[in-house]
Amino acid sequence: MSSANLSIKENGAMVVFGASGDLSKKKTFPALFSLFSEGRLPKDIRIVGYARSKIEHEDFLDRITQNIKIDEEDSQAKEKLEEFKKRCSYYRGSYDKPEDFEGLNSHLCEREGDRSTHNRIFYLALPPDVFVSVATNLKKKCVPEKGIARLVIEKPFGVDLKSAQELQSQLAPLFDEKEIYRIDHYLGKEMVQNLVHLRFCNPVISHLWDKNSISSVQITFKEPIGTEGRGGYFDSSTIVRDIVQNHLVQILTLLTMETPTTFSADDLRDEKVKVLRRTRLGDLKDIVLGQYVKSKDGKKPGYLDDETVPKGSRCPTYSAIPCFIDTERWRGVPFLLKAGKAMDIGKVEIRVQFKAAANGLFKDAYHNELVIRVQPDEAIYFKMNIKQPGLSEAPLLTDLDLTYSRRFKNMKLHEAYEALFLDAFAGDQSRFARIDELECAWSLVDPLLKYMEEEKPVPEPYEYGSDGPECLYSFLKKFGYIYDSPDYYDYPVMSVPSDH
């Protein structure tokens, strides 16, 4: 039975592969509980955690609920949590033995009970090297004869264009493209979802959204922690694979795509693919690659101090990458993708700087900027000039500030995984990457990955807890960004998140 565009409203089950991992306890199960408590999941939902670790049932329940926060005085919330735990179970198995998947299918059937159809979502929070063996065994042993089957796959999908294509060639005979949901959790974040509405619901913004009005665009990811024991994994991934190729490129496409015919999943992704195919890197020698060293006070170690990192590694933990889009709308506008670990603060934001007024009447006016803060403290603010209050005629820089926590005090903003899991049950693929979209993203960064592998450039050092390499200022200046915020200007208040 085809699963295209069909919503799973009953007879639903979800298998969480990698259920013993940190992502499972920190994000996956809290998101599923939130949806369950709001009645957004199928009313008869069954959730099975699957991993290789030996975990007793009660220990598993304790593990998956330790990050779920409820009001202990709220009896209804406590009842919901207990009911949720009854819907969850654990099954231990390997990722390559058919008999373990046969056992999983029996476990699912037992949990599901007497159903006329079996609608199953298989969520793979696993290393890419086991995707194919898991998908193969699922197809043979666990895909129902009557019902819907969907494969939800966590990033990374490959490590470059070639590996992504090889992986897809092995998955394609097993699951149709309409059954594969490739997750980039940034597409579930509130402010990333909001980009489409911001651009296409507001004519005042739409009319300014091109090379005639915009001088530069920055997409910035800053994380305040380093690799902290994950250096072995990160060293093979690099900041380019870990953050730029997926999160930042996805944001770039939503910022720059043309108006889709409709907001159906394929129409939306068609436009993203079109703009990606016209996107290219700037000169490789203009790219800033950095690696953090110990903090100024010596309390935080450098990247090479991590025992899991290979000695002498030149893996970049920071990158600033210029991109250009060869379309009539965007030709000549630099898009600067900046990402780094062990930074001064944690934030993800989009900064659109507009060109100076052409009339020349106010030579001391400041540049307008539209800033979209993805996290923390979701916000949109527009930096603008007004007359300085009082008798002066001098321009004063201020902003129109839409900070969500102040404007929408009684409205819950759902976590990214909540939105994405809900879409997976609904059969909506618009916030999941299609294979040609992923291929374009890898094609974009592949020249940089090849340059890093072959030339092994020495990364610029920057202190743990700093704003990045010292050459960053000259990089931004070269690509037209103008620092002109006066000392008196106070940026909207922001807190620092612990993760991304």
Swiss-Prot record:
Q: Keywords on this record?
A: Carbohydrate metabolism, Cytoplasm, Glucose metabolism, NADP, Oxidoreductase
| Sequence positions that bind NADP(+) 1 | 18-25, 52, 155
Task: List, alphabetically, the PROSITE patterns matched.
Answer: G6P_DEHYDROGENASE
Do you know which Pfam families this protein is assigned to?
A: G6PD_C, G6PD_N
Q: What class of enzyme is it?
A: oxidoreductase
Predominant cellular place of this UniProt entry's protein: cytoplasm
Pathway given in the UniProt record: Carbohydrate degradation; pentose phosphate pathway; D-ribulose 5-phosphate from D-glucose 6-phosphate (oxidative stage): step 1/3
Q: What exactly does this protein do?
A: Catalyzes the rate-limiting step of the oxidative pentose-phosphate pathway, which represents a route for the dissimilation of carbohydrates besides glycolysis. The main function of this enzyme is to provide reducing power (NADPH) and pentose phosphates for fatty acid and nucleic acid synthesis.
Protein name (database record): Glucose-6-phosphate 1-dehydrogenase
Identify the species of origin.
Schizosaccharomyces pombe (strain 972 / ATCC 24843)
